[in-house]
């Protein structure tokens, strides 16, 4: 599916960013079930720079806005050549001001939180670039090439928002690896109004 020309990606992103904010108590650093895998100095620096966002209110103050839904793939999913193992992502907070042709380790476009009790706990960051901005070349960061291009992930973005992305689980161990999109250790409450369980096939 082709992406709209010019700067049309701004409108859906801004509409997405204007979504109702999730009300949550500030969250402390998430205790891990097991030790985190060793991180490169670059990843350690990114984790330290983003630690302030363990409080989601600080994230909102700095321009991140909740997309509300807790994204879960209980049976895994496929999206063309991209495979999502069984697991969840969580609640995405998007900062449209960070979208551009250069990826900054200290300025991810998306922060990801897990609902735990009555709080949101920071678990991961996501580097995201619309296909139009990437200008035909898959971007990379932390020695990893972003997955894509792929259609926008409904229901939190329009399918016309084709993009590249990379999830990095900086604060919660991912049994399948730090750069795997879904995390089997992350849980979305099945009874919660805003939990979105996606089926075996994304599209």
Locate predicted features.
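Bacterial N-terminal signal peptides
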Residues: 12-23
């Amino acid at each position: 599916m082709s992406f709209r020309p010019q700067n049309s990606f701004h409108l859906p992103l801004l509409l997405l960013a204007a979504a109702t904010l999730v009300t949550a108590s500030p969250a402390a650093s998430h205790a891990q079930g097991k030790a985190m895998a060793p991180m490169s100095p670059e990843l350690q620096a990114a984790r330290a720079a983003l630690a302030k966002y363990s409080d989601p209110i600080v994230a909102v103050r700095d321009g991140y806005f909740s997309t509300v839904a807790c994204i879960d793939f209980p049976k895994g999913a496929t999206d063309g050549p991209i495979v999502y193992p069984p697991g969840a992502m969580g609640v995405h907070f998007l900062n449209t001001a960070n979208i551009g042709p250069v990826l900054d380790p200290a300025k991810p476009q998306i922060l990801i939180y897990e609902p735990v009790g009555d709080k949101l706990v920071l678990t991961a960051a996501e580097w995201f670039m619309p296909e139009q901005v990437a200008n035909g070349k898959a971007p990379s960061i932390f020695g990893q090439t972003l997955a894509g291009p792929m259609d926008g992930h409904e229901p939190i973005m329009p399918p016309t928002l084709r993009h590249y992305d990379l999830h990095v689980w900086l604060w919660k161990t991912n049994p399948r690896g730090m750069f795997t999109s879904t995390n089997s250790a992350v849980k979305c409450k099945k009874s919660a109004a805003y939990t979105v369980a996606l089926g075996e096939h994304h599209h």
